[in-house]
Amino acid sequence: KKDENGSNFNFIINKEPIFIKGANYIPPDFFNHRASKKYKRVIKDALDANMNMLRVWGGGIYENEEFYELCNANGILIWQDFMFACCMIPSGINEKLDKEFKLVINRLKKHPSIAIWCGNNESLTGWKKWGWQKQYNLHGEDSIKTWNTYNQIFNQHLYFDDSISNNYNYWPSSPSSGTNQLQNKYSGNQHEWGVWFGQLPFNQYSKNAGRFISEYGIQSLPEINTIKRFEPSIDNWSLETKELQFRQRSKMPWIKEGYDGFDMIDYYINIYFPKPNNLQEVIYLSQITQALALQTAAESHRKNKPYTMGTLFWQIDDVWPTISWSTVDYFGNWKAAHYAIKEAYKPIIICAEEKNNHLKIYVINDNLKPISGTIKIKLKTLNGIIIKKWEKKIIAETNKNQIFLNIPLQSIFNNKNKNSVFVDMKILSNNKIIDSGIHYFVKPKDIALENASIIATIEKNVIKLKSNTLAKNIYLSSND
């Protein structure tokens, strides 16, 4: 629907606009019979992280019935790509494709979880922006024929298929701002790869938040025990070893010859965190960096509601044991980013933003009922001393984001160094904490952290940690 900025991209269920929170999904194994055994786990991982949509990416497969039935039963919406990714289609096979489309649509159209069908992944972008005509020597008549075939398939055959148009939404290409129009932030959907492939900082997620962001992400390494399952001698490894290089498939020669995902992981770690000294620290910091990126993106998109109405990161799962953009590794272990997304996707969250020399405190309520409560904001030193505090009774309205406090930054610091304080935020209702968060005023590497003395106690199946000062991003692991 058109508005004063362009055209929105909303999903409306039972007459209510729903903010979409989810991820891109790829087959969880190369072998389909093994992949089907993982459906329950992947969908549970999505539910446990407060997701309401998975995008079945066009470079994978049309999944088995069990996958769609599980999504139906668990309330997970599906963005269903047709299986065309980063490619153009040769002429002369339209009839065969029509048969394939009818088979696919007739098999899947009964599933209420399918919320949208999409013609292809990044084919429009590749043709108009990535220089495919030059790369594949398509000029003159060849170029016209290739483009006409694209138009026939994605803007005529599929667009006017009664099976889709009468019952479902159809979108010709992801990303795009409309039929044959490249993506922009004013209409349609976006793939935000300025972060990662463009080496932009994480505030790009806020600066370029469009109507619906259906891809974004950065890589991280899986935990050490996962790597040991495909190479037991990992303790003697570095990122340059051929075994790890083999599993790194993100290549970026336009930045520099030989530049790959490991270089980019190192690039982003060094922007936000201290330089790692060994492979174990690289693994840990890569996951913390990915978590920071996805949390920043998800909160930025949610704060931009209702202009932005959806966020789908790349990607929830892995197809093999590898180094990738996933938040859950091949063996089902959550990375730090999946825990971060679980928090950022909660129905009600409290978060902050520095803008125009003020600290803005948001409460975002995606529920279809209002909630009354109290927000409590404390400015603290790193060892827990409260410097200032603010408290306000609020009503978080149905399906909205609201700014409840707008605090001048000058009044917050008052001769305190930005790197030695943080803001502790909580929203309470009926004396129960609904959500909590922390806002730092500097990059993690610039926080004046002290050496922490941490005491761990175990009570039945609960581990409690106590520290004499702020201990940031604690990671617990077990060999069991």
Give residue ranges: language-model regions.
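Active-site-adjacent substrate/metal-binding segments within catalytic domains
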Residues: 1-116, 252-288, 465
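Secreted/periplasmic carbohydrate-active enzymes, especially glycoside hydrolases
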Residues: 1-54, 303-304, 308, 333, ...
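Residues that line or immediately flank small-molecule/substrate-binding pockets and catalytic motifs
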Residues: 25-27, 58, 121, 174, ...
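Flexible loop/turn segments at secondary-structure boundaries
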Residues: 27-30, 61-64, 86-88, 123-127, ...
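A general structural detector for well-ordered alpha-helical segments in enzyme core domains, enriched
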Residues: 42-45, 67, 97-100, 104, ...
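Active-site-proximal structural scaffolding
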Residues: 64, 97, 110, 151, ...
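Active-site neighborhood of glycoside hydrolase catalytic domains
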Residues: 73, 90-181, 289
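Substrate-binding clefts and catalytic carboxylate motifs of secreted carbohydrate-active enzymes
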Residues: 117, 124, 160-187, 191-371
